[in-house]
């Protein structure tokens, strides 16, 4: 159950970050149309929903796992969001980014073994 809650937290908060980026991309396109057009976009609402669900999953997870064990696992969001940046937004990911992501995964694996 804890692993499922952690995964749900990661996916919801990662989705929320992607939806925030989609929000600002859309807002650039409709900037001249004012706030009404901005608020009609589905992206800010998806961001709020995903981040809200992520918070709920996180709170449920904290009922089962110590925060010192659970919180470092959220670093995996750096990996998820970087992958989304590359494949959804076609942003460049260089070797330095990849090395950093590998270090994050190694750190999470190391901390996960001790938890």
UniProtKB/Swiss-Prot annotation:
The protein's annotated pathway: Bacterial outer membrane biogenesis; lipopolysaccharide biosynthesis
Boundaries of every EamA domain copy: 46-113
Domain of life where this protein originates: Bacteria
Transmembrane spans: 42-62, 65-85, 93-112
Keyword Chloroplast listed: no
Membrane topology annotation: Multi-pass membrane protein
Entry keyword Membrane: yes
GO cellular component: plasma membrane
Main location: membrane
Localization annotation: Cell inner membrane
Any GO BP: transmembrane transport
Swiss-Prot/TrEMBL keywords: Cell inner membrane, Cell membrane, Lipid A biosynthesis, Lipid biosynthesis, Lipid metabolism, Lipopolysaccharide biosynthesis, Membrane, Transmembrane, Transmembrane helix, Transport
Family classification: Belongs to the ArnE family.
Record's subunit section: Heterodimer of ArnE and ArnF.
Stated role: Translocates 4-amino-4-deoxy-L-arabinose-phosphoundecaprenol (alpha-L-Ara4N-phosphoundecaprenol) from the cytoplasmic to the periplasmic side of the inner membrane.
Name this polypeptide is given: Probable 4-amino-4-deoxy-L-arabinose-phosphoundecaprenol flippase subunit ArnE
């Amino acid at each position: 159950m804890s692993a499922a809650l952690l995964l749900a937290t990661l996916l919801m908060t990662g989705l929320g970050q992607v939806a925030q980026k989609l929000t600002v991309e859309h807002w650039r396109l409709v900037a001249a149309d004012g706030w009404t057009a901005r608020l009609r976009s589905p992206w800010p609402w998806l961001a709020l929903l995903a981040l809200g669900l992520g918070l709920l999953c996180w709170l449920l997870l904290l009922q089962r796992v110590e925060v010192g064990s659970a919180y470092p696992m959220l670093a995996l969001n750096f990996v998820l969001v970087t992958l989304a940046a590359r494949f959804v937004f076609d942003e460049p990911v260089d070797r330095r980014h990849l090395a950093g992501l590998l270090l994050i995964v190694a750190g999470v694996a190391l901390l996960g073994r001790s938890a």
